[in-house]
């Protein structure tokens, strides 16, 4: 439901290299299962004969992180957008916390979330964006629900890791981002904090984010030397 926020960054990156987008969709009666999604993702990536760069935002980033831990030989690098040192934390965890604490209905809290995640969009777009968030509640792989929110310990991976976030994100705050640095195992792993944009900073600052990602990739393996196959895959859930 939230893939539309990824498109500006996809377009920026596509000017430099070929990009494939992998999406995992589940029906409303299917339980959210990261394990099932990992199996499906692995089946897809087995078709590629060389390691590729993985990129994911929020829960999609968590899925990429779990995959890189299981199959580092298939991952050239991993870029995480809005993924904190507690990699399970996402906007839905904040939403359910507010549902438990505040005497408000779903619609009211979703509208509050729109302002928290995006700043102050035009009033006529708030309701539309709230419906997009509602759709994500029912369709995404987020491991949280009304009765319980999930927490994960930091996951260290052997592959080069680029962690990106925003200085004004209320979901993944700068402390969550900085805590990543003690878990960097690869010498080329790094952290970059965007000057704004909140939870969807890669939508509002697509050019600046793409510059950081391209710089990161070039340090690992210059893009001008890449062969002409799908070198980058963005995960969507």
Where are these regions (language model features)?
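Gly/Ala-rich beta-loop-alpha elbow adjacent to hydrolase catalytic centers
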Residues: 55-64
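Catalytic histidine-centered segment of alpha/beta-hydrolase-like enzymes
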Residues: 31, 197-210
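Conserved alpha/beta-hydrolase "acid-adjacent" motif
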Residues: 170-176
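Flexible "cap/lid" loop of the alpha/beta hydrolase fold
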Residues: 69-105
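Short beta-strand/loop motif that positions the catalytic acidic residue
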Residues: 157, 163-165, 169
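Conserved alpha/beta-hydrolase catalytic His-Asp/Glu region
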Residues: 89-91, 106-155
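Active-site loop/oxyanion-hole signature of alpha/beta-hydrolase fold enzymes
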Residues: 7-11, 17-53
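Short glycine-rich catalytic loops that host catalytic nucleophiles or stabilize transition states
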Residues: 22-24, 191-197
């Amino acid at each position: 439901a939230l893939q539309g926020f990824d498109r500006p960054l996809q377009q920026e990156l596509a000017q430099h290299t070929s990009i494939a987008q992998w999406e995992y969709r589940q029906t409303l009666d299917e339980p959210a299962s990261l394990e099932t999604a990992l199996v499906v993702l692995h089946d897809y990536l087995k078709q590629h004969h060389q390691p590729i760069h993985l990129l994911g935002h929020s829960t999609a980033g968590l899925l990429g992180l779990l995959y890189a831990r299981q199959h580092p030989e298939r991952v050239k690098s991993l870029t995480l957008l809005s993924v904190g040192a507690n990699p399970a934390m996402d906007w839905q965890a904040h939403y359910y916390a507010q549902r438990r604490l505040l005497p408000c209905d779903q619609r009211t809290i979703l509208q509050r979330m729109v302002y928290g995640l995006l700043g102050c969009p035009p009033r006529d777009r708030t309701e539309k964006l709230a419906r997009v968030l509602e759709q994500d509640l029912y369709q995404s792989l987020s491991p949280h629900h009304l009765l319980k929110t999930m927490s994960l310990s930091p996951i260290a991976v052997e592959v080069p890791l680029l962690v990106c976030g925003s200085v004004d994100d209320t979901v993944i705050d700068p402390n969550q981002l900085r805590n990543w640095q003690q878990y960097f195992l690869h010498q080329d792993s790094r952290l970059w904090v965007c000057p704004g944009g909140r939870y969807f900073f890669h939508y509002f600052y697509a050019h600046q984010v793409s510059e950081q990602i391209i710089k990161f990739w070039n340090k690992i393996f210059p893009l001008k030397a890449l062969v002409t196959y799908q070198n980058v895959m963005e995960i969507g859930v």
